[in-house]
Amino acid sequence: MDSSPNDGVHQPLLHPQPSPSPPESTNGELETVLSDVETPLFLRLRKATIIESKLLFNLAAPAVIVYMINYLMSMSTQIFSGHLGNLELAAASLGNTGIQVFAYGLMLGMGSAVETLCGQAYGGRKYEMLGVYLQRSTVLLTLTGLLLTLIYVFSEPILLFLGESPAIASAASLFVYGLIPQIFAYAANFPIQKFLQSQSIVAPSAYISTATLFVHLLLSWLAVYKLGMGLLGASLVLSLSWWIIVVAQFVYIVTSERCRETWRGFSVQAFSGLWSFFKLSAASAVMLCLETWYFQILVLLAGLLENPELALDSLSICMTISGWVFMISVGFNAAISVRVSNELGAGNPKSAAFSVIIVNIYSLITCVILAIVILACRDVLSYAFTEGKEVSDAVSDLCPLLAVTLVLNGIQPVLSGVAVGCGWQTFVAKVNVGCYYIIGIPLGALFGFYFNFGAKGIWTGMIGGTVIQTFILAWVTFRTDWTKEVEEASKRLDKWSNKKQEVVPE
């Protein structure tokens, strides 16, 4: 049921409510082309590919820029820290990959509930609900951030308990203390990001992130080298940079004409139905966390090897490069989530299915090219992070595994994006548990420790889990009944926009 201004469901505190206009990406043009059986198949596919490519790249290109620049901020912080010494590099790597990614995965995962609901609500033209979903998610993520703060505060004893060396654990905890403000930036940023993406508004975030990157680099240089603030200064600057992005994006939302229909001002509805929203957010969080924590465990296991500093340095450099390239796939992930959820919400099953095919092709080709580049530059990659010859040789030795990971990243994140667009988070979470934690991690530990293959063995085993997970998601996506998914999306929208559901939590 659509909510109206006076139905008691949504009582805005700011701004009048204008009449909505149909979203450009779901105007039915692509569905019409794909359904035109009188046109030869080749001509239909060519025209549909042109339409979808335009829609996709209008979403994906700015989204890739946003994710890559956000990741570059963390990557540059690690580079600044690494040039202080090998211990500082290991500490920043462990703090970033071992602690920060824990929070990042949880908060981004919970924010993905907004991606499903806002995307389908926008496609179904239930615009007034988007602002409510944004605010409700921010409330939930802020409460979650309070709990995560405890992990940051007690990061040193946690790392020691996990078997990390005292020197690295102590330095990493200092780095992590400066990242505490970043937790609450995540709580605001991820819902805002998904709110904008669901409306195909991505370019402003790209501009904001690009400008913030230059500010971040300047402030990092001042804090680390000129003011001598070391690891703590580097992480505090990273937190500040994330808050700059949050504030700038929110100012855009409340002042932009493009968000006039979806942002109706602050609403008390943000505090109702929290338990029902939490259950959906938790399913999204579990799905994504099981993925992000998987490679976090890879780095933690490397810290238990015979030469932990070398293993951490070499593996974390590879993971940083992988993560940077992964941001391209995450951009495609965001694009396909929006495309699928919008088309399902608008009742266009053929368009949703066609979008999945096109984005997988583009993402895979991009990542294969980058994997080839990585292999060609394997002997010089590490010198951007550290000057050590020993670390450089270790990184070069791991590059073939890095290339395989990049190719898998051309498919797997996109399939996860399809899952978010369709609302399959619970199913994917179960697949991730089986493939990652029942198969991948035990295999990695077996190869790395029992057979003494070290970091290469750990990584090889865990790649095996990723391969199985990718095949399962590809098979399920291939067999999807998209007409049925349209019906499920309609039911989901009716549930979440129903007046009684909004007022009374389940």
Swiss-Prot record:
Q: How does it sit in the membrane?
A: Multi-pass membrane protein
Give the superkingdom in one word: Eukaryota
Location of the region described as Disordered in the Swiss-Prot/TrEMBL record? 1-29
- What's an example Gene Ontology biological process for this entry? xenobiotic detoxification by transmembrane export across the plasma membrane
One term under GO cellular component:
vacuole
Q: Which Pfam families does the entry link to?
A: MatE (PF01554)
| Transmembrane region(s) | 55-75, 89-109, 143-163, 167-187, 201-221, 227-247, 285-305, 316-336, 356-376, 401-421, 433-453, 458-478
- Record keywords: Membrane, Transmembrane, Transmembrane helix, Transport, Vacuole
Where does the record say this protein resides?
Answer: Vacuole membrane
Task: Reply yes or no: does the keyword Ribonucleoprotein apply.
Answer: no
Q: In its UniProt entry, what is this protein called?
A: Protein DETOXIFICATION 40
